[in-house]
Amino acid sequence: MITFLLFLLLGFVTNVLPADNTKAYTLTTLRKDYLKASKDEAAARLFYKKMADYNERHPVVLAYKGASEAVMAKYNWNPYNKLKHVKTAGSIFKEAVALDNANPEIRFLRFTVEHYIPRYLNLSEHLKEDKGVIIEGLKKHPHSGMPTDMAKTIRDFMLTKDHCTEAEKEVLRNIVL
């Protein structure tokens, strides 16, 4: 009888206690969440709330936390709050880059944020440096640490608009992924 009660209690505790949060921060999930957040305000708010709870120091996950701050600036109407989110994102990106300065995914996230910040704010100081790391990371693929689908996403983004010079675009077009 006591054994039965212990098993019953154990079953209750495992169903009621919160599960381990690490699964919520898998890179595959974060990539999907960020893509949704960049297109939809409700998804952005959920992504921001989720990432606000992240307190570990995994460099790529930190970069997604920075991206969650930046995406909130997109949907915020108040200029002061927009700037606050962008500056917080910058601080988080700085920490992520310090932890892994050669990671092309971290640099890509920061590049995408800084590229869309108005130049007169002087908050886009890493574009050239980040672009160099991104291109070098793509050249090293599949030894860059990124899955092929992410590498393709990055390459495709870098080939659009004015993200790269024509010479850089030619290099990117010649990278086989």
Provide a role label for each language-model segment.
Residues 1-26:
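Bacterial Sec-dependent N-terminal signal peptides
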Residues 134-177:
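Terminal, low-structured helical/coil segments at or just beyond the last alpha-helical repeat
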Residues 35-48, 82-90, 123, 127-131:
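Helix-turn-helix repeat elements of alpha-solenoid scaffolds
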Residues 35-38, 71-80, 116-121, 162:
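Short coil/turn linking the two alpha-helices of tandem helical-hairpin repeats
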Residues 65, 72, 110, 154-158:
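Structural register within alpha-helical repeat arrays
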Residues 50-51, 89, 96, 134:
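Canonical positions in the second alpha-helix
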